[in-house]
Amino acid sequence: MACIIPPSIVMVVYASSSGASVGDMFLAGFVPGFICILALIGLNTFFAVKRGNKESVEKTDYTAKERLRITGDALLPLLMPIFVLGGVFSGICTATEASVVAVIYSFILAVFVYRELTLREFYKVAAESVVTTGVIMLIISVATPFGWIMSIQNVPTLFAGWRLSITSSKFLIMAFIFLLLLLLGTFMETMCIIILVTPILLPIAQTLGMGVVHYGVSMLMALMVGSLTPPLSVNLFTSCRVLNVKYDEAFPDTLWVILTVTACALLTFAVPGITEFLPAILK
């Protein structure tokens, strides 16, 4: 869900690849994300009632003082998304500047407020961040010329002509794009897909009447489904590792989650108003 619920890094990457507004992308992700959350809550509730799951986390009674302390501890980190989104939506700062504010704010909390980040840990975190950033920048440095070559060679127009020679059905072409993105999402990293296929698929989607923002959110929804689907199943493997659950035990129930998220993704593809509603009324 992180890829469509702001603030989302992959939305920023898509915006830089397509020329879309980062603020519009953030706004467009709220409604599809909310629909997905409601659908998954409904799915979990259905299976909990059907299977009679009565297991629950042990309840603890907190005093008013303890509740106030816990709320205070959680309040400062929870303010970070407000600073980021508020800065972007209000126009005070760009997405890049907002990310710098978030990093500085996190550093202050970790070092001076919670005092959990030592000098050695800071060096380790900084080194990992440099490696991650370097990988992303390397991908962008290769993908940007790739997109330029695609445009110079008129590849999107050739693809558009090819799809018209096969079918003129908007439904079939959108289904093809959705299935292609889902397939790519099963074995490729999301950012790589966004950077590589946006210059090719976005012009085709625009010939079908899809806006840049609508296509972007729809693409991220399809890639989210792919990240749950074998063989890679990045999100599923991560969840299994965190919860100490075997993959083959988790997958049967995950199939229902995949079907639910797929239905939400198809709904987002088919109904532009889901993504365009908030950006339109808040401009």
What are these regions (language model features)?
Residues 1-283:
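Alpha-helical transmembrane segments of multi-pass membrane transport proteins
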